[in-house]
Amino acid sequence: MKKKLNTKKENNNFYILVNDLFLKIEDNLNLYENEIDIDYEIQDYVMTITFSNKTLIIINKQEPLQQIWLATMQNGYHFNYKNNQWICNRSNKNFWEIFENACSIQSNKDLIFCKK
């Protein structure tokens, strides 16, 4: 007999993880609101971050895959939640390392984010 997965519970947990990540991103971006021109908006679990040079970073959830996707000027990244962090499925780097680097490049300013 095949075991049925409780996808509702898994999806609820996924939404909690995504919400938590998006809130942390917002908090970190808000730390720099007086230093650099960064605008962001969130609609239907898609966060669009616009820098003063009009470059974008887009972060969105991929519910069927249980992933977070990050699109930057440099590349696109897919993250799975492993060991209490979002890990890139190609480089094994954590989300914050890649996101912080992309924001620093696209804003032309060294940004350091608090990940807690």
UniProtKB/Swiss-Prot annotation:
SUPFAM superfamilies reported in the protein's UniProt record: Frataxin/Nqo15-like
Organism: Buchnera aphidicola subsp. Acyrthosiphon pisum (strain 5A)
Gene: cyaY
Membrane-crossing residue ranges in chain numbering: none
Protein name: Iron-sulfur cluster assembly protein CyaY
Sample GO molecular function, one term: ferric iron binding
An annotated GO cellular component: cytosol
Family: Belongs to the frataxin family.
UniProt superkingdom: Bacteria
Function comment: Involved in iron-sulfur (Fe-S) cluster assembly. May act as a regulator of Fe-S biogenesis.
